[in-house]
Amino acid sequence: MTTTTTTSNTSNNSNAQFNFFKMCIGRPVVVKLNNGVEYRGILEVVDGNMNIVMEQTEEYLNGQLKTKYGDCFLRGNNVLYISAQPRK
C-alpha cells in the first residue's frame, strides 16, 4: 500500500502529518520536489519545516535514474509531496 501526504500549512492536518512521518521513519519513501525531481530512499529524519534526511538515496528526473547518494538532505520548502513505499 502506498500512502501519500502533501505539504499544508493548516493546523488541522498537523497531527495527521506528524503521525504519517513518524510511521515512515526507517521506511522507503519517494520525495518529489516542486521542480519535478524525485528522490527515493530510506527516510531517516523529518522536522516541522519538512526538512528531510534520507539514506540510500537515488535521484530521478523524468523517471530516469540520474545520481545515487549515500545520505541526502532536502530542504522542506522545496518538497511537493512525500509518498511511503512498500518495504522491499
Swiss-Prot record:
Gene Ontology molecular function terms on file: RNA binding
Gene Ontology biological-process entries: maturation of SSU-rRNA; mRNA splicing, via spliceosome; tRNA processing
The keyword Cytoplasm is annotated on this UniProt entry: yes
Sm domain span: 16-88
Keywords: Cytoplasm, mRNA processing, mRNA splicing, Nucleus, Ribonucleoprotein, RNA-binding, rRNA processing, Spliceosome, tRNA processing
Main location class: cytoplasm
This protein's record includes keyword Ribonucleoprotein: yes
Any single GO CC term annotated in Swiss-Prot or TrEMBL for this entry: nucleolus
Localization per Swiss-Prot or TrEMBL: Cytoplasm; Nucleus
Description of how the protein assembles with itself and partners: Component of the heptameric LSM1-LSM7 complex, which consists of LSM1, LSM2, LSM3, LSM4, LSM5, LSM6 and LSM7. Component of the heptameric LSM2-LSM8 complex, which consists of LSM2, LSM3, LSM4, LSM5, LSM6, LSM7 and LSM8. The LSm subunits form a seven-membered ring structure with a doughnut shape.
Family per similarity comment: Belongs to the snRNP Sm proteins family. SmF/LSm6 subfamily.
Biological function: Component of LSm protein complexes, which are involved in RNA processing and may function in a chaperone-like manner, facilitating the efficient association of RNA processing factors with their substrates. Component of the cytoplasmic LSM1-LSM7 complex, which is thought to be involved in mRNA degradation by activating the decapping step in the 5'-to-3' mRNA decay pathway. Component of the nuclear LSM2-LSM8 complex, which is involved in splicing of nuclear mRNAs.
Entry protein name: Probable U6 snRNA-associated Sm-like protein LSm6
Organism listed in the record: Dictyostelium discoideum
Gene that produces this protein: lsm6
